[in-house]
């Protein structure tokens, strides 16, 4: 059974078959940007499964393998005879060529990585309105030596004679580059050409349409039963709260567990915003004291995470029993979690899908089985950027919708070493200054994350003609599209100066501010 058939009533217009590319999810996101619903499935998805889904088109992703290798991942050859338009990207194009009778060989001294100008030979169909000379992103070590019968060249580059190919009669197309990445200047034009003009899709994947479908699905699933949501204040759980309130009203109970590791003023803001301003009932659980006691003397970051996660589950269990009974638990599973768990993890030797546990929303995945919740996952079709759009449409304020990612364990993992109340107060004040100044400079929405880290060492300083021996604060600001990779943000010097001066002068116990200029990889965004 195809993993997408459990995704609700809507069937995908475009199916992406994943061959291990780091860009497979990005292809799906780019298709969705054209307001066409797309999903990612494993490359072993059979032609029969695809026929049952009845997509308007299929895209074969790139991948790290060589099509002529013994253990190369291959698609069902019957796919070529479905009569559905197919676009092969990089490895996907090479697979198309190889399976249809062409030849792919290792590039001898002509591998292409990075940007390359595309010379258009046939500006029709896939390449309509794509300017010759447009920059495309190349990443391949193999090349097409001979095209299958019925195929012709659409474009070339200096090192790749067959950079784009087509069999117009069978509506089969291939590109040796990656149109989905931002470096490919004409990439979105090609994707629109394929989706709209070749596949004949309609732009019906809109935020409003999703909300209507999600509301109807939730009402149908839960009926008149009670539903529980663990509210963290992040964009996912906040969007869920608004969506569920719209769908089932007072059947929803939100539980906010304040573990004492949130940023300054956040617990008060959340209660004021949800419970009083928007009349969404929130049960506030003050568990600060029990969490900080559990971390007494703990310095190892993984142990801190484990303790916080375990304690969260215990508190959640206790309070859900007290407030319940509840029939349903809302989880913030997003589409990347669905892809990871069932869609694309395939053993190349057997072709079998390998299940990976879906990430749990806000640490509720380890709840005791005797609580017997049924899961409600209204956002499981969406990528993160789509969740933000839904939140805006539902009326969430920008300060929540555009909130920078914040780890579940909160400030506890931005304090290196042991967590104490004194350090938490110090870090809260420093972190608030960072966010205030980045926002005042108009850079908040241009930066993926901007925050402060407290180090477990002290440094010598001079303040008011007196020697000080206090903590240093690390300023961590990164730019990213999805958090998988990130570059350190080049903040203006005058902004860094303002942040540093304010922290040193206003935050008790700090006498030095340093800047983390490490990208991911090799570093991670968070320090713990």
From Swiss-Prot:
TM annotation in the entry: none
GO MF annotations in UniProt: ATP binding; GMP synthase activity
Active site: 90, 178, 180
Pfam families documented for this protein: GATase, GMP_synt_C
Signal peptide from the UniProt entry: none
Residues annotated as domain Glutamine amidotransferase type-1: 13-204
Keyword list, A-Z: ATP-binding, Glutamine amidotransferase, GMP biosynthesis, Ligase, Nucleotide-binding, Purine biosynthesis
Domain GMPS ATP-PPase: residue ranges: 205-403
EC number(s) reported in the record: 6.3.5.2
Record flagged with keyword ATP-binding: yes
InterPro entries assigned to the protein according to its UniProt record, in alphabetical order: Class_I_gatase-like (IPR029062), GATASE (IPR017926), GMP_synth_C (IPR001674), GMP_synth_GATase (IPR004739), GMP_synthase (IPR022955), GMPS_ATP_PPase_dom (IPR025777), Rossmann-like_a/b/a_fold (IPR014729)
GO cellular component, one term: cytosol
Sites where the protein binds ATP: 232-238
CDD domains: GATase1_GMP_Synthase, GMP_synthase_C
Biological or metabolic pathway of the protein: Purine metabolism; GMP biosynthesis; GMP from XMP (L-Gln route): step 1/1
Coiled-coil parts of chain: none
Catalyzed reaction equations: XMP + L-glutamine + ATP + H2O = GMP + L-glutamate + AMP + diphosphate + 2 H(+)
Functional summary from the UniProt entry: Catalyzes the synthesis of GMP from XMP.
Subunit (UniProt): Homodimer.
PANTHER family in the cross-refs: GMP SYNTHASE [GLUTAMINE-HYDROLYZING] (PTHR11922:SF2), GMP SYNTHASE-RELATED (PTHR11922)
Protein name: GMP synthase [glutamine-hydrolyzing]
Organism lineage: Bacteria, Bacillati, Cyanobacteriota, Cyanophyceae, Synechococcales
């Amino acid at each position: 059974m195809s993993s997408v058939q459990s995704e609700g009533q809507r069937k995908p217009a475009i199916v992406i078959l994943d061959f291990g590319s780091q860009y497979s999810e990005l292809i799906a996101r780019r298709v969705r940007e054209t307001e066409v619903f797309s999903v990612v499935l494993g490359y072993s998805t059979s032609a029969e499964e695809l026929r049952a889904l009845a997509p308007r088109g299929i895209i074969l992703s790139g991948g790290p393998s060589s099509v002529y290798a013994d253990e190369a991942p291959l698609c069902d050859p019957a796919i070529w005879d479905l009569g559905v338009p197919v676009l092969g990207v990089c490895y996907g194009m090479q697979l198309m060529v190889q399976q249809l009778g062409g030849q792919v060989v290792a590039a001898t001294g002509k591998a292409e990585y990075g940007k390359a100008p595309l010379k258009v030979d046939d500006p029709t169909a896939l390449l309509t309105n794509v300017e010759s000379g447009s920059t495309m992103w190349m990443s391949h070590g193999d090349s097409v030596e001979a095209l299958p019968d019925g195929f012709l060249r659409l474009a070339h580059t200096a090192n790749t004679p067959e950079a784009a190919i087509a069999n117009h009669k069978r509506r089969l197309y291939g590109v040796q580059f990656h149109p989905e990445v931002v470096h490919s200047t004409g990439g979105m034009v090609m994707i629109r050409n394929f989706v709209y003009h070749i596949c004949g899709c309609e732009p019906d994947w809109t935020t409003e349409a999703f909300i209507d479908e999600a509301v109807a699905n939730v009402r149908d699933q839960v009926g008149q039963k009670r539903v529980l949501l663990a509210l963290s204040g992040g964009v996912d759980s906040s969007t869920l709260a608004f969506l569920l309130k719209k769908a089932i009203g007072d059947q929803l109970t939100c539980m906010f567990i304040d573990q004492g590791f949130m940023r300054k003023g956040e617990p008060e803001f959340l209660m004021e915003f949800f419970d009083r301003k928007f009349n969404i009932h929130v049960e506030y659980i003050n568990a600060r004291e029990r969490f900080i006691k559990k971390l007494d003397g703990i310095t190892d970051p993984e142990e801190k995470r484990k303790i916080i996660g375990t304690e969260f589950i215990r508190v959640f269990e206790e309070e859900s029993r007290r407030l319940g009974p509840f029939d349903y638990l809302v989880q913030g599973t997003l589409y990347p979690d669905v892809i990871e768990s069932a869609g694309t993890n395939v053993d190349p030797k057997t072709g079998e899908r390998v299940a990976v546990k879906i990430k749990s929303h806000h640490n509720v995945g380890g709840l005791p089985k005797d609580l017997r919740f049924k899961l409600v996952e209204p956002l499981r079709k969406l990528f993160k950027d789509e969740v933000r759009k839904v939140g805006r449409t539902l009326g969430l304020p920008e300060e929540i919708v555009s909130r920078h990612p914040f780890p579940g364990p909160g400030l506890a993992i931005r304090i290196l070493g042991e967590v104490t109340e004194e350090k938490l107060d110090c870090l809260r004040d420093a972190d608030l200054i960072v966010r205030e100044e980045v926002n005042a400079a108009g850079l908040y929405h241009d930066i993926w994350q901007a925050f402060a880290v407290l180090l477990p060492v002290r440094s010598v300083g001079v303040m008011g003609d007196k020697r000080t021996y206090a903590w240093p604060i690390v300023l961590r600001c990164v730019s990213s599209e999805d958090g998988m990779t990130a570059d350190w943000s080049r903040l203006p010097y005058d902004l860094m100066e303002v942040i540093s001066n304010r922290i040193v002068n206003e935050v008790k116990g700090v006498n030095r501010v340093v800047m983390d200029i490490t990208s991911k990889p090799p570093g991670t965004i968070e320090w713990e």
